[in-house]
Amino acid sequence: MEELKKIAGVRAAQYVEDGMIVGLGTGSTAYYFVEEVGRRVQEEGLQVIGVTTSSRTTAQAQALGIPLKSIDEVDSVDVTVDGADEVDPNFNGIKGGGGALLMEKIVGTLTKDYIWVVDESKMVDTLGAFRLPVEVVQYGAERLFREFEKKGYKPSFREYDGVRFVTDMKNFIIDLDLGSIPDPIAFGNMLDHQVGVVEHGLFNGMVNRVIVAGKDGVRILEANK
């Protein structure tokens, strides 16, 4: 599985060209993309500016010598490569398993060519088997948790090393164990209107293409946008 992730990540780096502003994703598959961009910067003299989606990716990019700017210093991003936890046939996806969904969505929204790299196990008919992350402000988080509980969403606060996980933006994450999300657009819209919800892991209609690595090689799926 790890080899498939590496193949997909390295393949995605082919979309990066000199002079681009590049969104650097977070997670186990995006890691290999960032490594390949770093290799090209060091060995080929590739001239790019990176915009990162988490503190982890920032540290990785700095170690590789990739020049960085903050999202506030750029008007748009030419290409962003990131992973995804699930992708459905309509190119909707769940992201945020690594806890970076807010920064990932901000960068993705400003990206001209948004690419996901996944192994074939992430391609599903219906979203929802993977728990849906919902990033919430700390104030009133318990109230939101109870509300999700009443609605039957099977919520759980994300924890790390036995303590409540805090995102780079100092928020909590409530993971919803929904099983199935038949209408991700409607569910995402509902969460968008929940006071106290900062962002959620439904990335609906955002991606331009998905690079899928499987036992039979690499497939590139183009979204009809």
Swiss-Prot record:
Keyword GTP-binding: no
EC id: 5.3.1.6
Pathway: Carbohydrate degradation; pentose phosphate pathway; D-ribose 5-phosphate from D-ribulose 5-phosphate (non-oxidative stage): step 1/1
Enzyme class label: isomerase
S-S bonds: none
InterPro entries linked: NagB/RpiA_transferase-like, Ribose-5P_isomerase, Ribose5P_isomerase_typA_subgr, Ribose5P_isomerase_type_A
Keywords from the named record: Isomerase
Reactions catalysed, as given in the entry: aldehydo-D-ribose 5-phosphate = D-ribulose 5-phosphate
CDD domains given in the database record: RPI_A (cd01398)
Pfam family name, one: Rib_5-P_isom_A
Keyword Methyltransferase attributed: no
Gene3D superfamilies listed in its UniProt record: 3.30.70.260, 3.40.50.1360
Active site residues per record: 104 (proton acceptor)
A GO molecular-function descriptor: ribose-5-phosphate isomerase activity
Superkingdom of this protein's organism: Bacteria
Binding site for substrate: 26-29, 82-85, 95-98, 122
A single BP term in Gene Ontology: pentose-phosphate shunt, non-oxidative branch
Family: Belongs to the ribose 5-phosphate isomerase family.
NCBIfam families: PRK00702.1, rpiA
Quaternary organization: Homodimer.
Function: Catalyzes the reversible conversion of ribose-5-phosphate to ribulose 5-phosphate.
Protein name, as recorded: Ribose-5-phosphate isomerase A
Species annotation: Streptococcus mutans serotype c (strain ATCC 700610 / UA159)
Gene behind the chain: rpiA
